[in-house]
Structure formats: C-alpha cells, structure tokens
Amino acid sequence: MASRQPDVPAIEHGSSGLLGKMSLPVGMHRRAFSYDDALDDTAPMTPPPSDMCSNTMWRKPIIPERKYQLLSKIEDGDSNIPPPSLPPSSSTEKVPVVKAKATSIIMNSLMTKHTQESIQRFEQQAGLRDAGYTPHKGLTSEETKYHRVAEALHKLNMHIGESTEEKQSSSAQSTPCSTPSSSPKQMRRSWFSQGSTSSLPAGDLSNSDGGVDKWSMFGPRAVQKSTTDPGGFTVQPYKGAQKPTPMELMRAQASRISDDPAALKPPKMEMPSLVSGTKNIPRGHNLKPRDMNILTPTGF
C-alpha cells in the first residue's frame, strides 16, 4: 500500500495516552487510502507501531553546544578534543526567559531614527549632499534638482547667446543688404512675439528674464538680453529660406491664372434638392406591432 499511494503529511493526535485527552499533536504520515485498491491488495492491513510517539524530535530537541568552537582544533589535528556534551532536557526547560514590552515612546523613536537614516541615504545616493543641501531649507529634493537644472541651462544659454551675437555681427559686415539676415522683415521664431516684448515696461523686463530663460530650452533660437540696448531684446533671425512678399505671391498667382484659363471659372455647386425641384418629404415612423411593447407604459 505504501508503494502504491503517496504519503501525505498530516497532524494527528498521539495515541500513547501520556497526557490523556490533552495530548500534543504528533507529526506523522497519513496514507491517501483508497478502498478500491484495498480490495485488490491481498496484503494484511497492519496498525501503526506502538512506539510512534516515543522518538519525536520536538520533545527532546538536539541542541549542539558551540557548533564552530572546536573547528580550528580539528583542522590542526589535535586529538585531545573532548566530545561535545549535550545539556539535559531538564536544564534547558528551566532557563528563565525575560520578556520586555516595548512602549510606544521607544517604537516612535526607533521609527523616527530609521526614517531619518533612510532619508539621508537617499540624499547621498541622489547627489543632494554634495552641494550642501539640507532638508530644512523648505525645498524638496525635486525642487532643488529643478533649480540646479535651470541654473545650468541659464549658463549654457548665456554662452550660446554670446557666440550667436558674434556670428551675426561678423556676417552683417561681410554680406550685402539683400540677405535675409539684414532684411527689414525678419521671421522671428521664438515663444514671445515682438509686440509682447516691446509692450513690457522697463521694470518688468528683469522679472520676465526668468521666464524667457525657462522657455528658451524648447525653442530653436534663444532669446537673449541685448548688451548694447539695455531696454530691449535681440531676436535671432531666421537663417533658412526667405519668406516671399505679398506682391510676389500675387504675381505668381496672376501668371498661373493666365496660363490656365479654366481656373477662371468658378466651381460648380451641385445641390440635388434644387436641381430635381422636389422637396424632401419627411417620412413617417415605420413602427411594427412588436415595437409597441417598448412604447407602451408599464401600467397597461
């Protein structure tokens, strides 16, 4: 039977009767019993042995005394090693156990200390401790990171603005007046139009510098404060193809119309209701008897 059915671990009550009805549970194996297999099997069904509960490990546990204490002596080859003496079970059961109840004050102090240590560890990993940042300044770590990125971008934009101004001044001296860079009608590719920047008073320009620097990272050209004119901005010109004037657009359209006379005719508007001359008659509801079940109130 044991070879045919797998053993299923179970918790059964000991049958030795040492403690009567209050006997402790004993770890034993219960076979998954099948009556069909028992009818076919001719082997006798034997009861479990009577000494099953006598050699359980939890009644007298094996506790090694100083597990790694004599390891160095064994490696050195010392033969005068006394055998490890096992303490009796009575002495192990009589060891007094001291239980201390943690108060809420101790738990709160431990939680606070653990939280502070985790915050300091996170700040060191994120690199916030290098710049002398302390969490008591009223700023979170994300805000300080944002301010540092903005400062770095501001310094980068200042260097870019100086180099572009030098390039613009050198190109204006060497090129004729028909180039797009010196033309009076410039295309301004920036987040702020000319009217919005020129209408600001002189006192608000210092406050709007931060906004300009903040948004300049999205645009292709940086809007920088002019070094010569303290009250205005220098807008970088569009370096690509020149925008055609309205007169050139009208000339090109007139030449296209003269080449193609069919373009002078207005487009035809096809309205089928006016062509046929009949009005759209509103159709009535196409209700069937089965639809009356939905339209009828529930009281009928």
Swiss-Prot record:
- Keywords for this protein: Cytoplasm, NADP, Oxidoreductase
Q: What does UniProt list as this organism's lineage?
A: Eukaryota, Metazoa, Chordata, Craniata, Vertebrata
Q: Where is the composition biased (Low complexity)?
A: 169-185
Location of this chain's protein in the cell:
Cytoplasm
| Presence of keyword Oxidoreductase | yes
Coding gene? p33monox
Q: What does it do?
A: Potential NADPH-dependent oxidoreductase.
Q: What protein is this chain from?
A: Putative monooxygenase p33MONOX
State the GO CC annotations.
cytoplasm
Instruction: Select a single GO molecular function from the record's annotations and give it.
Output: oxidoreductase activity
Q: What spans are recorded as compositionally biased (Polar residues)?
A: 191-209
EC no.?
1.-.-.-
Keyword Oxidoreductase among UniProt keywords: yes
Stretches for region Disordered: 1-20, 75-95, 121-142, 162-245, 258-300
Entry similarity comment = Belongs to the P33MONOX family.
Among Pfam families, the record links this protein to: P33MONOX
